[in-house]
Design a protein with these regions (language model features):
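Bacterial N-terminal signal peptides
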Residues: 2-10
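Acidic, polar-rich low-complexity tracts and alpha-helical solenoid repeat scaffolds
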Residues: 12-269
Length: 269
């Protein structure tokens, strides 16, 4: 019986056999072992990034709380963070050990998640071209994946870092015209669009996108940030009354808004 159990485990470990047991074994191990630990490391790394970030509330805030100096943006100038390195290692391990590419089709439904984590960890280390490779892999190899919209969001975030704002705008608008995107995916797409428009100083278009992101996001911190940015954009466009209303909305969020947004909303009124 013991020998039979060992044999069954060995057979289940095969990435070349397309049956339910093999698919389930590799999918489960990818999700609850490798990806779980990798995502924990990724979230810790993101927390580190946000903790070291300092907002300049007197200028229009970036939609994403991630500060990159010009030196860091140069090719090869990666930011070292053990958490991001661990996340990348876990993602690579998942792909190398648990991928079940049989007959040109991936049978492990967690591998696209692995590529998404791989791309994110590289993005936060400022390794933008390798990050884009990971996101593109999802878009081209897994066109029906639930992660397609997130892969596109992150790819266009890379394009913004590479100063390809017009390309990001073109790609995201094409997605919005061709697909029915909803919820957090829609919020994230418009947050990237808004950032691209802000960088190109097309503030009316940025305003429209921030409104959608604010409406669709399910995250309290994002909703507060986007509302504050709305106030800043209204100010830039000389819509003083609308700016006042936006800042008041932040104030009225009370504990649902980080204290810094509330303080500066009072100062802006």
């Amino acid at each position: 019986m013991f020998t039979f159990g060992i044999l069954a485990l060995i057979l289940a470990c095969s990435t070349k056999k397309d049956n339910y047991i093999n698919r389930k074994w590799h999918s489960t191990n990818t999700k609850y072992n490798v990806l779980y630990n990798g995502n924990l490391a990724l979230e810790k790394g993101i927390t580190d990034v946000k903790a070291t970030y300092s907002d300049d509330f007197w200028n229009v805030l970036p939609l994403e709380r991630m500060q990159i100096t010009p030196a860091e943006q140069k090719e090869g100038a990666a930011t070292k963070n053990a958490n991001f390195e661990r996340a990348e290692t876990k993602a690579t391990k998942a792909i190398q050990i648990h991928s079940m590419n049989i007959g040109g089709y991936e049978k492990n439904n967690q591998i696209d998640e692995s590529y998404l984590m791989l791309g994110k960890s590289r993005y936060y280390e400022n390794r933008y071209l390798p990050a884009m490779e990971a996101f593109n892999y999802i878009l081209y190899k897994y066109p029906t994946s639930n992660n397609v919209y997130q892969a596109q969001v992150w790819r266009e975030k890379v394009n913004l870092k590479l100063e390809n704002e017009q390309l990001a705008i073109k790609n995201l608008n094409r997605t919005l015209k061709g697909q029915k995107v909803t919820g957090q995916d829609l919020a994230d797409i418009h947050s990237v669009l808004a950032q691209a428009y802000i960088k190109k100083n097309v503030l009316d278009s940025a305003l429209a996108s921030v409104k959608i992101s604010k409406k669709e996001t399910k995250l309290k911190e994002e909703k507060a940030r986007y509302t504050f940015i709305l106030g800043q954009l209204y100010e830039k466009l000389n819509y003083s009354d609308s700016a006042f209303v936006a800042y008041q909305e932040v104030i009225d969020m009370k504990r649902k808004s980080p204290r810094s947004y509330t303080i500066y909303s009072h100062l802006k009124q």
